[in-house]
């Protein structure tokens, strides 16, 4: 019958469509069975010997063809962006045992398509086909790897995204990755060489964009958070004064510090000032006192991430009587998320090293044959790293000067209790950047609110200007109250609202971060 042929044809078309999409099913995912997730490898160099692993997550609440694309990088340097998927703003988190997943209702995929890149080569499942232990990279080589991978994404792997609006987004040391990659993309677009010209903006979360500002403001932040006494602070102001500084806010404390990699600075105990400021430097102090570097007010009574732990999750589970799930809750922790931050890395490490998970993700046989384990961060990369560009101002300047589109928008957001990349440094950095380019502050510092209940979520301000080509330029500086380094994890609801309102903001118009999602 004709109708049976029609039904067969429709079913065949559906099967072909599904097979062409190549959506993967994550083992242990029973909460979101219709998740549209793809994974694979992009070529990070011209000859294709460097393979960068990626996740591509399709938007849920907005049609894929209409939703913007966020291209995401974690920092480190040397840390995997899959931790952002499973621990920050992805749709699924890993349960304590490391074998199953549960839904994150505040995932950013509700409002955007998201590409997660494991950068640089050597991180996570990314690898070099010719070198089994590829760990030697720097700021410039990473920028080239990222640039080549993004081109390969648009040209070869997912050409259907070539007309999508897209934003580059990054966190922490991604405050270096993001501006450097953006400068390359803008330059390529200006030469009409880049496959997608719809580059709309840059998002930086708790960014490490200027070493001097980040290091010096850490002293200020610590001093005003009870890490010294009034008398000791007065002594610091006396002994650490530097030439030309009329106020402690402008002291160059780095003159009394030392470094081996140009990004991590320790107090120089051979100087009087160095001895005084050492307790204020937190994790980079030789007398580190054990507070959470990424969230000043967060505590874990058990450190699930100690380097010598063989299998801390297995050991903990063995101590929990059957069906007493409440025992998993950390009664001594200061968070309300079942202490997820305390054990998430270990759960994720266990999950992504399961054979069935790696098979589902399509991990290359060449990577598996090296008998390595997936790690949240590749510490040999970090240990060998020497920072090349300590100030991102020149790269922002390249972006602003060469941008040819109608408008380019920047969002700089920061958790206000992060001591790894503190909010003061980002605020000072943007203020100075705006001054260099003649931007005007069009919105003074003031609060924004989360949800229809108008709960204060932080503060924000805006700078606006234009370049010589007539492109409108804007920078929004947003703080998230009560959040540490990982804003989408610490304050998931406000983070989703903030990003959604930024993505849907209109050039030349004020973004309403208070608008509920």
UniProtKB/Swiss-Prot annotation:
Per the record, the domain of life is Eukaryota
- PROSITE patterns from the UniProt entry: CARBOXYPEPT_SER_HIS, CARBOXYPEPT_SER_SER
The cross-references to SUPFAM superfamilies, in alphabetical order and at most eight, read: alpha/beta-Hydrolases
- Give this protein's Gene Ontology molecular function annotations: serine-type carboxypeptidase activity
> Keyword set for this entry?
Carboxypeptidase, Glycoprotein, Hydrolase, Protease, Signal
**Signal peptide segment:** 1-21
EC nos? 3.4.16.-
- Catalytic residues, per the record, are 172, 418, 485
Gene3D superfamilies tied to this protein: alpha/beta hydrolase
Sugar-modified residues: 269
Which InterPro entries does the record match to this protein?
AB_hydrolase_fold, Peptidase_S10, Ser_caboxypep_his_AS, Ser_caboxypep_ser_AS
Where does the chain cross the membrane?
none
Pfam families from the xrefs?
Peptidase_S10
Write out the similarity annotation. Answer: Belongs to the peptidase S10 family.
- Protein name, entry field: Serine carboxypeptidase ctsa-3.2
Q: Which organism does this record belong to?
A: Caenorhabditis elegans
């Amino acid at each position: 019958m004709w109708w049976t042929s029609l039904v067969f044809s429709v079913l065949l078309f559906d099967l072909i469509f599904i097979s062409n999409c190549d959506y993967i099913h994550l083992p242990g995912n029973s909460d979101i069975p219709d998740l549209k997730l793809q994974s694979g490898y992009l070529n990070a160099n011209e000859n294709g010997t460097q393979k960068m692993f990626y996740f591509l997550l399709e938007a849920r609440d907005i049609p894929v063809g209409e939703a913007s694309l966020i291209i995401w990088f974690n920092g480190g340097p040397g840390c995997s962006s899959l931790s952002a998927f499973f621990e920050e703003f992805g749709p699924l988190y890993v349960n304590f045992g490391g074998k199953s997943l549960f839904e994150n209702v505040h995932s950013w995929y509700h409002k955007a398509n998201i590409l997660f890149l494991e950068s640089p080569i050597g991180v996570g499942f990314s690898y070099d086909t010719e070198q089994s232990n590829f760990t030697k990279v720097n700021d410039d080589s990473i920028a080239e790897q990222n640039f080549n991978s993004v081109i390969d994404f648009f040209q070869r792997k997912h050409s259907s995204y070539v007309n999508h609006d897209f934003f580059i987004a990054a966190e922490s040391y991604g405050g270096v990755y993001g501006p450097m990659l953006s400068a390359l993309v803008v330059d390529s677009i200006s030469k009409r060489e880049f496959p997608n010209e719809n580059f709309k903006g840059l998002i930086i979360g708790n960014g490490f964009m200027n070493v001097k500002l980040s290091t010096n403001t850490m002293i200020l932040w610590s001093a005003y958070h009870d890490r010294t006494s009034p008398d000791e602070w007065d002594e610091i102001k006396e002994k650490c004064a530097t030439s030309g500084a009329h106020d402690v806010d402008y002291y160059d404390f780095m003159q009394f510090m030392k470094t081996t990699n140009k990004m991590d600075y320790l107090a120089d105990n051979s100087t009087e000032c160095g001895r005084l400021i050492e307790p204020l430097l937190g994790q980079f102090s030789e007398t580190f006192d054990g507070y959470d570097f990424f969230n000043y007010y967060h505590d874990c009574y058990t450190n699930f991430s100690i380097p010598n732990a063989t299998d801390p999750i297995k050991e903990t589970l063995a101590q929990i009587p059957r069906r007493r799930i409440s025992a998993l809750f950390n009664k001594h922790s200061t968070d309300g998320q079942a202490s997820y931050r305390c054990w998430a890395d270990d759960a994720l490490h266990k999950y992504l090293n399961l054979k069935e998970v790696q098979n589902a993700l399509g991990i290359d046989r060449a990577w598996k044959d090296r008998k390595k384990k997936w790690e949240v961060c590749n510490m040999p990369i970090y240990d060998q790293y020497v920072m090349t560009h300590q100030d991102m101002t020149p790269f922002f300047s390249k972006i602003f000067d060469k941008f040819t589109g109608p408008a380019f928008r920047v969002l700089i957001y920061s958790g206000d209790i992060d001591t790894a990349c503190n909010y003061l440094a980002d605020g000072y950095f943007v203020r100075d950047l705006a001054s260099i380019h003649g931007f005007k502050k069009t919105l003074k510092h003031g609060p924004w609110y989360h949800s229809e209940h108008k709960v204060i979520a932080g503060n924000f301000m805006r700078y606006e200007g234009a370049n010589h080509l007539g492109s409108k330029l804007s920078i929004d500086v947003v703080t998230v109250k009560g959040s540490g380094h990982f804003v989408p994890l610490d304050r998931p609801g406000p983070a989703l609202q903030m990003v959604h309102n930024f993505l849907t903001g209109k050039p030349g118009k004020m973004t309403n971060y208070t608008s509920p999602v």
